[in-house]
């Protein structure tokens, strides 16, 4: 699927929902301007918040032949470029930012989604067989199965036999859920309903792994299960969300190749609203073809 097709899907879905298509915001001159500490000649004595935009835009190459080329390269990517060297070693500010980003990534893995946040969204909360974060990280197999209490809750409180069941799970990034929820779930649910699909009761699974959607689909009798789950964070990017969609999942027979994945959903990647439109189109095609993953015809 190329960019033109994605844009057409977004326009179609948003139009059917009666909403305007979001336009990309062009960076202003002020935003594009090189911050004080981004100058190649500025020393590392200036105190910056290592997580700020200024720190990310900092250029550490001293006495560059073409400073304008470095500035343009620095603006074009979030990768660690133009950081400079002190002999064979990274410069102090570059190293400190690396350590800060690493710390931020570890924090988002270890953080919990607050129960108050789940209640504020009006979501039913269930758990996998995991009881705490440490067990979640060391026993991924238990994160693939619902607890007995969760199974009872789904059977008693959720719509049975829906066309599409949407599930939200913390996964390996709490920030991915809390940062993107408002911009992806409401338009996703609205788009699915606008398409005439019977949508199940959305709910939140704490300590869930991807394969848990197979058991959910089997219990609820869902034709398509859509799991929105936090991705393992990378350095400097802790808010990336993934969508795993599968048709008619079964615990015993569904394999990873049966899933269709849309990853890198966040403001710096695939915008959540755009991802919602693509997921709606994907669910419709899965129901039409009665397939998902590598079994779908393109």
From Swiss-Prot:
Where in or outside the cell?
Bacterial microcompartment
Task: Read off the InterPro entries from this record.
Answer: EutC (IPR009246), EutC_C (IPR042251)
Picking any one GO biological process from the record gives: ethanolamine catabolic process
Q: What is its EC number?
A: 4.3.1.7
Where it mainly occurs, coarsely classed, is: other
Top enzyme category:
lyase
Regarding protein family, the annotation reads: Belongs to the EutC family.
- Function of the protein: Catalyzes the deamination of various vicinal amino-alcohols to oxo compounds. Allows this organism to utilize ethanolamine as the sole source of nitrogen and carbon in the presence of external vitamin B12.
Q: Which PANTHER family match?
A: ETHANOLAMINE AMMONIA-LYASE LIGHT CHAIN, ETHANOLAMINE AMMONIA-LYASE SMALL SUBUNIT
Under which name does UniProt file this protein?
Ethanolamine ammonia-lyase small subunit
- Record lineage: Bacteria, Pseudomonadati, Pseudomonadota, Gammaproteobacteria, Enterobacterales
């Amino acid at each position: 699927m190329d960019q033109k097709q994605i844009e057409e899907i977004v326009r179609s879905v948003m139009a059917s929902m009666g909403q305007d298509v979001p336009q990309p915001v062009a960076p202003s001159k002020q935003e594009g301007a090189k911050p004080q500490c981004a100058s190649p000649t500025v020393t590392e004595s200036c105190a910056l918040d290592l997580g700020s935009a200024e720190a990310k835009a900092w250029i550490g190459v001293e006495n560059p032949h073409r400073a304008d080329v470095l500035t343009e390269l620095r603006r074009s990517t979030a990768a660690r470029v133009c950081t400079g060297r002190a002999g064979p070693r990274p410069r102090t500010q570059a190293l400190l930012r690396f350590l800060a980003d690493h710390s931020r990534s570890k924090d988002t893995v270890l953080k919990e989604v607050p129960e108050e946040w789940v209640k504020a969204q009006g979501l039913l909360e269930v758990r996998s067989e995991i009881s705490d974060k440490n067990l979640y990280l060391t026993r991924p197999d238990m994160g693939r199965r619902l607890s007995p209490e969760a199974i009872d809750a789904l059977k008693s409180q959720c719509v049975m036999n829906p066309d599409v069941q949407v599930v939200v799970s913390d996964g390996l990034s709490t920030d991915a859920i809390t940062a993107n929820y408002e911009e992806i779930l409401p338009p996703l649910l609205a788009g699915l309903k606008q398409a005439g699909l019977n949508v199940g009761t959305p709910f939140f699974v704490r300590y869930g792994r991807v394969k848990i959607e197979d058991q959910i689909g089997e219990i609820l009798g869902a034709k398509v299960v859509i799991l929105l789950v936090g991705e393992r964070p990378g350095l400097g990017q802790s808010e990336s969300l993934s969508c795993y969609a599968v048709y008619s999942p079964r615990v015993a027979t569904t394999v990873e190749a049966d899933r269709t994945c849309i990853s890198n959903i966040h403001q710096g990647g695939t915008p959540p609203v755009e991802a919602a439109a693509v997921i709606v189109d994907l669910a419709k095609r899965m129901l039409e073809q009665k397939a998902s993953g590598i079994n779908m015809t393109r």
